[in-house]
C-alpha cells in the first residue's frame, strides 16, 4: 500500500483541511507514513499570512525537491494560501510540484466520494469549516486575495456533518472560518452564526460547541445572547484587536475604535462573567509610534486576555499596506515590542491560572499525552490529570491543584457524562 505524508503549517482551518485530505488519500488506497522519506505522496498545506510562515513553506518545498531527485516516484501536492487563486504562477515558480490546487478545494486526480469526507474515528474535538474566504480586506492581510470572497455552507449541511461526527465519536465541534461572525450573509435565507449555534445545540450527544475566528465589528447582540443562553456553547472567544491605537486601527481598516472594542468586551463580560478571551496583536505596523504601541500594551493589560497571539508586522504582497505604506519601524524595535507583549502575556496568564488552584472545573477529555489524560475547560484552558479509568470523550469534573502559564494540573472528582 503506497504511503502519504502531510506537512501542514498555519491556522486550524489548514489543519482541518489536511485531515480531510488525509482521509481522502486513504479512500484512494494510501496509508499514512511516519515521515516524508517513506511516502509516495507528500502534501504541503501552506500558509503565507506572515513572511516567516511563507519562508518555511518555500524551504520545505525545496527539501522535497531534493527528495524527489533521489526518488523520482515521489509525488508532491501543494495547497493552501501559497497557492491562492493563481495556480499558473505557482506552477511556474515550483515546476517540480506534481499537483497544485486551491485552498479548501479537493484534488482532481482521483474519484471524489459523495457526502462528507470524514475520518472513520474522528477526534473528540472535531473541526468543521462553516465558510471560506473573507470580505474585509484589512490593509495588512493577504487572506482575501488567497482564499477569495466569503462563501458559507448551509445550516442543514453543517448540522448533518456535525451529527455524523457525533455518531462516529466526537463530543465537541469547533466551527472554523476566517470571519465566522459574517457567516450566512451570502446565503439566500440570510442565516447568522447565532442561528447555526441554536441548530447545532439540538444535536443529541454533542456536548460542546466552539467557534473561531471572530471579527469585533461583526459580533451582534444576538450572538452574545446565544452564547450566554446555550449551555453547549463554550464561553470562549477569539477576538482579534490587532492594535490599541485608533490611528493604527484606521490604517489597518479594522472598522472599529479602541473604545468600541472595549465596549464590546464589556458587553461580553456582562453577559458571560466567566468568558475566556483570546486576541491577536500586530506590533510594528507602518508608522506605529512608541506612544501608539503603549496604547496597545495598555489595552492588553486592561482586558487581561487568556492568550495573546502577537506577531511583528511583515509586508504581504498584494495588500494595501505593502503597496502604500512604508515598513518604517526598525526590526530591533519590532522585536522589543514583541518581547514586551510576550512578557505581559506570561505574567497575566500565570496570575489568572494561579487563581484557579483549588477550584473546580468541567473538562472534556480529548485523549492521552505523556501518560496523562488531556482535556480542556469550557474556557479552553488545557488540563492534565492522572487516572486509570478510560476517560477519552468523557465530560468530567476536576479539582485544580497546580497551575503554569500554559496548562493546569487536576484531580478527577466525578464523571459527568461518558
From Swiss-Prot:
Residues 120-352 form the Radical SAM core domain. GO terms for cellular component: cytosol. Its cofactor is [4Fe-4S] cluster. It catalyses: N(6)-dimethylallyladenosine(37) in tRNA + (sulfur carrier)-SH + AH2 + 2 S-adenosyl-L-methionine = 2-methylsulfanyl-N(6)-dimethylallyladenosine(37) in tRNA + (sulfur carrier)-H + 5'-deoxyadenosine + L-methionine + A + S-adenosyl-L-homocysteine + 2 H(+). Residues 2-118 form the MTTase N-terminal domain. Its EC number is 2.8.4.3. InterPro entries: Elp3/MiaA/NifB-like_rSAM (IPR006638), Methylthiotransferase (IPR005839), Methylthiotransferase_CS (IPR020612), Methylthiotransferase_N (IPR013848), Methylthiotransferase_N_sf (IPR038135), MiaB_methiolase (IPR006463), rSAM (IPR007197), rSAM_horseshoe (IPR023404). HAMAP family: tRNA_metthiotr_MiaB (MF_01864). PANTHER family: CDK5 REGULATORY SUBUNIT-ASSOCIATED PROTEIN 1 (PTHR43020), MITOCHONDRIAL TRNA METHYLTHIOTRANSFERASE CDK5RAP1 (PTHR43020:SF2). Belongs to the methylthiotransferase family. MiaB subfamily. This is tRNA-2-methylthio-N(6)-dimethylallyladenosine synthase. It comes from Dehalococcoides mccartyi (strain ATCC BAA-2266 / KCTC 15142 / 195).
